[in-house]
Structures are given as structure tokens and as C-alpha cells.
């Protein structure tokens, strides 16, 4: 078995991906497959934390144009991320692997509050840690949350799961001449305006010296492949 490239990572998953081929909600077969991928990756000897978006349930930035204030809408979206974490936690635990959801919001009847100490302890106990509630503050995306939490818990990289196998010069689904980058610096990613992550996330990763690996989650086993150094993606670092 190949030695993993990283030993502690944050995996960023899109909430929209949880909907599968539906336009809304939770597609259980998709979540079950992701749970299996995360477990297989953990079995490589990697400590795994996960940040999930909430766009399959609610998008605060969209309702802010319909009479709901942006802070309120963002809070609703952050609560949706906790729902996704609980769904993934259940799918992981059905497979006999321990997982824990930690939230940026105090909700003791639902899950524990995120603290660095709690996250460190659960990761050391070989539990998959699911980080819900975003940053706990409006106006910040879950991409930024992933980088922030990675820096807080001492992760060595952020694995950004998307529906394409890296960062391209243009949308490869619209432009067949788009070129995939093997590697970019954080500044190049910012200057290029690539939409795979928001500028705040890239800037924070640059300031905290955190590599971001952008890859496609569509293929089963892709998380483990990235961790073992055999996967296809774009490394954003330096």
C-alpha cells in the first residue's frame, strides 16, 4: 500500500453533489458512495475532516434578493450544512466507522460545538470529523470554511472535490480547447479568477501556506487516489 501524501486533510464537498441527479435534497445512494470513499481513504492511515456545503437544501445568497436579509439567509444556509453533515455521519456509521459532527453553532441536542481541541481529539481517535455550520458568520462561503478549519486543526491540505478533474483555463464543458493546469500558485489562482473556489479561500490558503488539491469526486475511490498520489487533479500551492 502506497504511503499517503498527507496524513491529515480537510475534504471539501459540494452540497449540490449530495442531491445526486435530483435538483434538491439528499440522494442517499450518492451519500452512501461518498461515505465509502471517505472510509477507504481513512484506511490509508489519513485523518479526515470534512466540510460540506448546503446548496442542495438552501442557498442564502439567493434568498437575499427575495426579502430575506443576507445575514439571515446565510445563517439558514449554514444550518443546512449541519443537516448534510448528519446525513453523512449516519451513512458512515452504518458501515461501522465512527464519525462525529461538530458545528460552529451551539446546538447540544443535535451535535457538539466545534473547538480545535475536540476536533484534534476525535481525529486522533480515528473518527471522521464532519464540520458543519460554516464559519458561524454570514458572508463567508464553505470553501473559506474548509481552509479556515484546515488551518485551525493543523491539516496538511484541503481536498476540494468538484465535478471536474482540476482547474481549467475555461469551463471544459463549454470550451473544448480549455487546458487543465497540473499546478498553480495561490496567487495565480487568484489572479486568474478561476471559479473553482472563491477569492477569500484562495487568499487564506496562501496566507496559511495550505495546499489545495482540486479533483473530481465523480469517480469512486477518487479521494483515496489523491491521497496516495495517483489521482488526477490540480495542486494549488506556493
Curated annotation (Swiss-Prot):
Similarity comment text for this entry: Belongs to the UMP kinase family.
Keywords: ATP-binding, Cytoplasm, Kinase, Nucleotide-binding, Pyrimidine biosynthesis, Transferase
Keyword Chaperone included in the entry's annotation: no
Reactions performed catalytically: UMP + ATP = UDP + ADP
Pathway annotation: Pyrimidine metabolism; CTP biosynthesis via de novo pathway; UDP from UMP (UMPK route): step 1/1
Superkingdom per UniProt: Bacteria
HAMAP family named in the record: PyrH_B
Highest classification ranks of the organism: Bacteria, Pseudomonadati, Pseudomonadota, Alphaproteobacteria, Hyphomicrobiales
Listed PANTHER family: URIDYLATE KINASE (PTHR42833), URIDYLATE KINASE PUMPKIN, CHLOROPLASTIC (PTHR42833:SF4)
GO cellular-component term (any): cytosol
Ligand binding (UMP): 54, 74, 135-142
InterPro entries: AceGlu_kinase-like_sf (IPR036393), Asp/Glu/Uridylate_kinase (IPR001048), Uridylate_kinase (IPR011817), Uridylate_kinase_bac (IPR015963)
Function: Catalyzes the reversible phosphorylation of UMP to UDP.
Molecular functions per Gene Ontology: ATP binding; UMP kinase activity
Encoding gene per record: pyrH
Activity: how regulated: Inhibited by UTP.
Pfam families per the UniProt record, alphabetical: AA_kinase (PF00696)
Cited CDD domains: AAK_UMPK-PyrH-Ec
Keyword set includes Kinase: yes
EC number: 2.7.4.22
UniProt binding sites for ATP: 12-15, 55, 59, 162-163, 168, 171
A GO BP annotation: UDP biosynthetic process
Protein name (Swiss-Prot/TrEMBL): Uridylate kinase
Subunit text: Homohexamer.
Record localization: Cytoplasm
Bilayer-crossing regions: none
Amino acid at each position: 500500500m502506497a504511503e499517503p501524501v498527507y496524513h491529515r486533510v480537510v475534504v471539501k464537498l459540494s452540497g449540490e453533489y449530495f442531491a445526486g441527479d435530483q435538483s434538491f435534497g439528499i440522494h442517499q445512494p450518492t451519500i452512501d458512495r461518498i461515505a465509502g470513499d471517505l472510509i477507504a481513504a481513512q484506511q490509508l492511515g489519513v485523518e479526515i475532516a470534512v466540510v460540506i456545503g448546503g446548496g442542495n437544501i438552501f442557498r442564502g445568497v439567493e434568498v437575499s434578493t427575495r426579502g430575506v436579509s443576507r445575514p439571515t439567509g446565510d445563517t439558514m444556509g449554514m444550518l443546512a450544512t449541519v443537516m448534510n453533515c448528519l446525513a453523512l455521519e449516519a451513512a458512515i456509521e452504518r458501515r461501522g466507522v465512527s464519525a462525529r459532527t461538530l458545528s460552529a453553532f451551539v446546538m447540544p441536542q443535535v451535535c457538539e460545538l466545534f473547538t480545535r481541541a475536540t476536533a484534534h481529539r476525535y481525529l486522533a481517535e480515528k473518527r471522521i470529523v464532519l464540520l458543519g455550520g460554516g464559519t458561524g458568520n454570514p458572508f463567508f462561503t464553505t470553501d473559506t470554511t474548509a481552509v479556515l478549519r484546515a488551518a485551525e486543526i493543523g491539516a496538511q491540505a484541503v481536498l476540494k472535490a468538484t465535478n471536474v478533474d482540476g482547474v481549467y483555463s475555461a469551463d471544459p464543458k463549454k470550451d473544448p480547447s480549455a487546458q487543465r493546469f497540473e499546478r498553480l500558485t495561490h496567487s495565480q489562482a487568484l489572479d486568474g479568477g478561476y471559479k473553482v473556489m472563491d477569492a477569500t479561500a484562495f487568499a487564506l490558503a496562501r496566507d496559511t501556506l495550505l495546499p489545495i488539491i482540486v479533483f473530481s469526486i465523480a469517480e469512486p475511490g477518487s479521494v483515496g487516489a489523491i491521497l496516495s498520489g495517483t489521482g488526477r487533479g490540480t495542486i494549488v500551492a506556493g
